């Protein structure tokens, strides 16, 4: 998946999620496209630096559905904003959404996905095995009322163990060196009951 990134306290989880996706092996062709227009060494598949997350965040705020942009307002963006920005830049040719959990599982076993879901306080603290839980119904409803959300990558599904693996952008100090496991039934609750979004970017040829 490339180096673990750090969103550095910005509300730019969207930008760093798309950075993580672009640094994944399956998106090497898309990464090459970014490098072709942003680095002196064109047509390389070298990993993108951490500060690219901030650049994508800025672009996303200009393409999303919200009435602000960063800078000056660091109020976040959306998965749609990130996808539209990278499509406009020619980094991805297309993207689609999946609104069915079975489709999420199917895609999640084929390529990394961008997830935007409710994020409760307890999800920030993986247990000793790197597993996160979404908390109680009361905690979920409180997070929903407070508008607490987060964008992150789904990088795999272990169907026998009923676990999804996610990549965050809070340094290697978080979870399993920047990643965590989430029970699939709890992920389904976030996506289906609390209207999470699941973006599937089109992979470019490497």
Which functions belong to the PLM regions below?
Residues 1-206:
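Catalytic-core signature of thiol
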